[in-house]
């Protein structure tokens, strides 16, 4: 857990999830200011369109499709299920969000969560490499859950961040085995 000090009086905000803290005053004021606007639903209003354009621009991909979803679990479930084949699973830290906090949402889609040991909430490239080598080294691997992608929480559930080097090392293993990270 990481505490973020926001004043000299040591008042702290705890970023445990997206619903444990209140909203910033400016956010609340904007909600008040726009409360009586009549908007179309399902992400087709001008606020959503503006957000989508900003995301495309930030990604440098103006022709991308952007879908706005309501929460992290739903987003993880949809992305993981979309990226994986039916026989593939997602590799994650034992403490990773998809391993512990999604109440089985990922496995509900039919994809197993393949857990790796963690240190401070992070997985390391060497452990990932061993898992994949062990999988492909097994003569019966075609009857097992394939490691199809790697999920990391950034920051982790411990509040730690992956270094650039750690991310590059994980990415190298993922690229070698053609697994999305």
Language-model features: where?
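Short, Lys/Arg-enriched N-terminal segments with co-localized hydrophobic residues
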Residues: 1-11
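Polybasic, low-complexity association/targeting segments
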Residues: 11-31
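Conserved N-terminal alpha-helix of the aminotransferase class I/II PLP-enzyme fold
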Residues: 24-72, 94-99, 105
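Conserved core of the PLP fold type I
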Residues: 63-84, 114-121
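Conserved PLP-anchoring active-site segment centered on the Schiff-base-forming lysine
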Residues: 82-100
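PLP-dependent aminotransferase-class I/II
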Residues: 110-157, 161-169, 176
């Amino acid at each position: 857990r990481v505490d973020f000090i926001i004043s000299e009086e040591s008042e702290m905000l705890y970023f445990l999830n997206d619903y444990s803290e209140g909203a910033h005053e400016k956010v609340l004021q904007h909600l008040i200011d726009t409360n009586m606007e009549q908007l179309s639903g399902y992400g087709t209003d001008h606020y959503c369109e503006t957000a989508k354009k900003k995301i495309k621009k930030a990604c440098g991909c103006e022709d991308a499709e952007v879908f706005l979803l309501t929460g992290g679990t739903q987003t993880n479930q949809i992305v993981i299920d979309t990226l994986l084949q039916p026989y593939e699973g997602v590799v994650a830290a034992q403490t990773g969000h998809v391993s512990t906090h999604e109440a089985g949402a990922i496995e509900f889609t039919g994809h197993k969560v393949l857990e790796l040991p963690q240190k401070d909430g992070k997985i390391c490239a060497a452990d990932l490499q061993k898992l994949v080598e062990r999988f492909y080294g097994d003569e019966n691997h075609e009857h097992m859950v394939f490691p199809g992608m790697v999920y990391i929480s950034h920051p982790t559930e411990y509040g730690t961040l992956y270094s650039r080097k750690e991310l590059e090392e994980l990415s190298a293993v993922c690229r070698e085995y053609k697994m999305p990270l």
